[in-house]
Amino acid sequence: MAERYTAENLTFTRSGRTLTDNVSLSLSQGELVTLIGPNGAGKSTLLRLLTGYLKPDSGGCSLAGKALDEWHPQTLSRYRAVMRQQSQPGFDWQVEEIVGMGRAPWTRHPEPSIVREVLQLTGCLPLAGRRYHALSGGEQQRVQLARALAQLGVTERRAAWLFLDEPTSALDLYHQQHLLRLLKSLTRQGHLHACVVLHDLNLAALWSDRILLLHNGRIVSQGIPETVLQADALAHWYGAQVHVGMTSGARRTAGFSRPLA
């Protein structure tokens, strides 16, 4: 399995509006990349294009030099998983069964040992035995992360590509840090790539290996956090005053103060 997931000249238009405008990028194993930008910048659309859930008007994506639509869906699902903003299955299964769904590309038989290992890894073991629809929004997000990791077989340290759309939106502060710390730990092992849509610039600053800043469907800045998170640039693209500081002299942190007049 090649170590790159690439997109070339992606353009996507809907209702006369260009949501993704000639975007090219390359994603490597062993890194955590975040997509940031104001509302309407095209972050979620780009994520859907990267994963093949949307078809671009022009351009395309490839894994291991092979276009996504040339992969057999079951085989592709062994290497690429997606965690959406919201996921409400039409059946009220127990947590273990929801996580076990992630193993569908591999087997039709239950794999309780793998499910339990992933539940432990994601801090979801206390949720075992509960009905999915009875969980809070944050608990459901954590279970969906466990499902995606089970799908990719991350406990087996395989090449894998995980795409997450605002995975921290319903989480409290502790679980936001836990989720991103886990992703960082897994990517550092060198097998997993994580591409994450985030609105919280502070989280992006603290955990990203690389940041892509989008505006009006284009990548307007990309690089390490120290390069992208510049106060003047963020104020320009977000239309708000931004405070940028340093933590331990190494990592930038960014927070909004007030909109620009």
Swiss-Prot record:
GO terms for cellular component: plasma membrane. It comes from the Bacteria. Residues 5-241 form the ABC transporter domain. Its main location: membrane. Keywords: ATP-binding, Cell inner membrane, Cell membrane, Membrane, Nucleotide-binding, Translocase, Transport. The keyword Cytoplasm does not apply. Its EC number is 7.6.2.-. Coiled coil: none annotated. The keyword Nucleotide-binding applies. SUPFAM superfamilies: P-loop containing nucleoside triphosphate hydrolases. It is found in: Cell inner membrane. GO terms for molecular function: ATP binding; ATP hydrolysis activity. Gene3D superfamilies: P-loop containing nucleotide triphosphate hydrolases (3.40.50.300). Pfam families: ABC_tran (PF00005). ATP binds at G37, P38, N39, G40, A41, G42, K43, S44. It is a peripheral membrane protein. Belongs to the ABC transporter superfamily. Heme (hemin) importer (TC 3.A.1.14.5) family. Part of the ABC transporter complex HmuTUV involved in hemin import. Responsible for energy coupling to the transport system. The complex is composed of two ATP-binding proteins (HmuV), two transmembrane proteins (HmuU) and a solute-binding protein (HmuT). This is Hemin import ATP-binding protein HmuV. It comes from Enterobacter cloacae. The lineage of its organism: Bacteria, Pseudomonadati, Pseudomonadota, Gammaproteobacteria, Enterobacterales.
